[in-house]
Amino acid sequence: TYDPGVELYEIGDDLERSSELELMIPHPCVIGNTIGSIYQKELGSLLIRAISNRLKYQNIRCNVSDAWFLSDKNHFVFAFSGVDKANLLQQVSELSNEMESIQKNGFKQEEVEDAINEHLRRLKVDNSTQLSSKWCDDFVDYVISDDRYIQSDSEMKQLADKIRATDSATLQQLLREWLSYKDQTLLVAYRNNAGKQNSLKKEEVVQAWDEGIKNPLKDFTYARKDVKEERVVTPA
């Protein structure tokens, strides 16, 4: 369990490297034991991919992830790196502004299609002979969390079809759900590499996030990158 509100953990560091800031939002994890629930897990991964692509496209420096942490909780994480506190807080505002834009305006259709195609390329049924250690890991996952895995081509096709049918509204709804848990608990980890004068208060993080939401939303136009056809050289 987590205490309600914002919890900030700061560590001083005098090595020559950037300061780092992580915002972690605990939220319920999904147990994948049916095609529907496995799709819900994959939907989370698809959302992370779509957000990451958008941030890269908008030149917003932030690494986004979502992974199981403990018990029945995942951590939805935004990670930043910067020269000092002011720089990090500016990045938080830019990130929250883009999250607000996605929640209100969604992803472009081409954005969703590209994210889906990227995601589907990594999905496959593992028909190879598994080591005993892998079987043990799978069994532990099943016993602890009831997670199951896709084991046939027909099941994978069902899953892929559901993923292909995903639209922006579905991803927006999931993003709103995850971000809503920020109002319950927000964990902030800060590695201060810029001295005591750059010590951070949790109120400053909240203020930076709120400022980003209040700022005018940026215009966004998505243009697909040209994919060069791979040249295949055949033997003479």
Question: Model segments located where?
Answer:
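Proteolytic maturation boundary segments
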Residues: 1-26, 32-33, 37, 48-52, ...
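A structural supersecondary motif
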Residues: 24, 48-82
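Feature marking long nucleic-acid-engaging regions of large polymerase/nuclease enzymes
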Residues: 28-41, 53, 66-69, 107
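Intrinsically disordered or highly flexible coil/loop and linker segments, enriched in small
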Residues: 32, 52, 56-61, 101-108, ...
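Detector for Asparagine
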Residues: 33, 53, 59, 63, ...
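Aromatic/basic-lined ligand-recognition segments
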Residues: 135-136
